[in-house]
Each structure stands twice: as C-alpha cells, then as structure tokens.
A protein has these predicted regions:
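Catalytic core regions of nucleotide second-messenger enzymes
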Residues: 29-46, 78
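Catalytic-core segments of nucleotide cyclases and related cyclic-nucleotide turnover enzymes
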Residues: 52-86, 93, 97-114
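Short glycine- and acidic-residue-rich catalytic loops of nucleotidyl-transferase/cyclase enzymes
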Residues: 1-5
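Non-catalytic regulatory/interaction regions at protein termini and inter-domain linkers
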Residues: 104-132
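N-terminal sensory regulatory modules of PAS/LOV and PAS-like folds
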Residues: 6, 25, 90
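Heptad-repeat coiled-coil signal-transmission/dimerization helices
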Residues: 22-23, 67
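Catalytic strand-loop-helix junctions within cyclic-nucleotide turnover domains
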Residues: 9-18, 37-40, 46-66, 91-92
C-alpha cells in the first residue's frame, strides 16, 4: 500500500512544541480505521519535520533545502518501521557542518553527531495492516 505525501507549513508552532504536534498528528491518524467491505484497515503515518527558518551556523537555509531534509527525515521514519516521526532540530557547530554531505546521507550525519534529530513514536499497540 502506498501513500501520499503532504507538506504542512505551521508557522505558529514554536520550535519547542514541534514534537508535541507530531505526536498529535500520529495519534489522530492512528485513531482512523477504514472499513472496506467489512475489513478493518488500520491507518498509520510516517512524518518528517523541521523548524523553519533553519540555520547552519549563522547561515539561514533556503526553504527548498529544508524541505529536502524533511523529506529525508520522512524516509528515515518509513525505513525504521513507520508510525513514527523523525525531526531535524538543528546542526552541530556550524563551522564543521557540510550541508552537501548531510544531504547525501541524513541518517549517517545524525549518527555521527552532525545533525540534532528527535524521534516521536506512534502508539505501539496500534493494529497494523497485514502489508504495512
């Protein structure tokens, strides 16, 4: 089963509440069950998120690059089991951060300490569709 990708721009959400908003979206989607011909289909979501504006050191990133990082975070969420959100919070010391390298492999950059990320998990007891 495939899904659609959506971009939500939420300028009124402060940085310190982004994890909470991701958790609320996960819970809201997880609470949805679709009845198709008497078969209950559970719905889940994978989320990538980041604050905007986002800076590397003192240099503000172009919105296109932020969206690219969010997309990469989304795919990290999908590859690590879905029903979760991966968020980019910021970067290590701006002088040693190479954004081109980070954009090649966000997960490696995160694990090597170049990127500050957060993970928000959905309900682990959520019923999963057989092919999720």
């Amino acid at each position: 089963w495939g899904g659609e990708e959506f971009l939500a721009f939420l300028p009124s959400v402060p940085r310190h509440r982004m994890d909470e908003v991701a958790a609320r979206i996960l819970a809201g989607i997880n609470a949805t069950v679709i009845d198709h011909g008497g078969v209950q289909i559970a719905v889940n979501v994978s989320i990538g998120f980041a604050p905007f504006p986002l800076a590397v050191g003192k240099q503000m990133m172009a919105w296109e690059r932020v969206v690219n990082l969010v997309d990469m975070a989304l795919y990290m969420a999908k590859s690590h089991g879905r029903n979760r959100a991966y968020g980019v919070r910021g970067f290590a010391d701006g002088d040693r951060v190479n954004l081109d390298v980070i954009e090649q492999n966000l997960e490696h950059a995160w694990r090597s300490g170049q990127v500050d990320m957060t993970i928000v998990y959905g309900d682990p007891d959520m019923p999963r569709a057989a092919n999720a």
